[in-house]
Amino acid sequence: MFEKSVEELTELGAQITTAEIAQQPELWRDTLNIYRENKEAIEAFLAEARAMGEGRLSVVFTGAGTSDYVGDTCAPYLRHAGNTDLYDFKPIATTDIVSAPRDFLRDEDPTLVVSFARSGNSPESLAAVAVAKELVHNVKFLNITCGPEGKLAVESADDPNALTLLIPRANDKGFAMTGSYSCMTLLSTLIFDTASDEQKAEWVETIAKMGEEVISREPEIADYLAGDFNRVTYLGSGSFGGLAQESQLKILELAHGLVATSYDTSMGYRHGPKSFVDDKTLVFVFVNNDAYTRQYDIDILNEIGGDEIAQHTIAVQQEGATVYEGESFTFKGYEALPEGYLALPFVMFAQAISLLNSVRVGNTPDTPSPTGTVNRVVKGVTIHPFTA
């Protein structure tokens, strides 16, 4: 797909999505520059947020669908790489905040709501902000969005309690969130990671090179899809649990449900969900670089591979002291990356799988919902009035 002409891709209904997957390494470098250019404003805003009360500031990462999985991906990493003396990181979907506010927000907790949104126009994004303002006594809003003209950015422009950071080049035009997911994940990680800016820059350059490698290894990725399969499952631990959920959603969306999907944590999969696996199932496991966690990822790979039921059991991993010795997509020759950054080249692998599979089943990746019942920006949501 990545070597096809624009004309060939257009005929397949895949030109937009293919280009948006391929451009991500460049966008990650851009995102690093956005972080650098806004660092002073970010630090000043976070200082104001911390001043709202004593103790740790509740940092709520929120979004819907893929935007929700941004928080699910970065929060586990930041719970040990961020400053947890100052911040309590919590991923909570906008759909949960809006539908049951008191179950997820505490009125007395000083709170920073970090909203992730591609367009900034989904009803839940806007309603979550309104609900938080109504319920929480001391609250500020950090908006990370790709839509400069979206309602989230426009309506918060004059709000002294809000800071909006824009990643406009990541505002995907295709149906699926690809660059928007990876860039919002990266920017939030850069903001709260306590590593030095020099170290962050090195990690960003490494993931950009790994992303470029994903594109060049497309034939290898395509080989995993050569057989007759109708199920795909993704597993991962820590931050890769959120990544697994995002990866299975991409398969589901781009194939319009023609391939069944599941996801879980590496350890959780044994507790019932493993029943999903049959001889027409592809199992992908994202292998963590943390030496302790990695053992559990490799354990489930060895177990499922040893069962000899799944059509393929594939590790997505970086070369390390221990690796899965069975089928794998392995990145070699790079420094070992922490999970908050390694998630990005890993998701490019998953996006490539989803793109190739969409075409395999005869669907059009750029417009995968032929009935129009699933939309790029969610429609048909009724937001009911809320009073604290």
Residue ranges and their predicted role:
Residues 1-13, 144-146, 227-233:
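An N-terminal domain-start capping segment
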Residues 53-205, 237, 286-325, 329:
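Glycine-rich phosphate-binding loops that contact phosphosugars or nucleotide phosphates
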Residues 7, 11-24, 29-65, 101-113, ...:
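Glycine/serine-rich loop-strand microenvironments at binding/catalytic pocket rims
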Residues 2-18, 25-26, 30, 157-161, ...:
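Phosphate-moiety recognition in structured ligand-binding domains
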Residues 17, 23, 61, 65-77, ...:
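Conserved phosphate/anionic-ligand binding catalytic regions in large, soluble enzymes, centered on
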Residues 20, 31-50, 54, 157-284, ...:
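Active-site phosphate/pyrophosphate-binding segments
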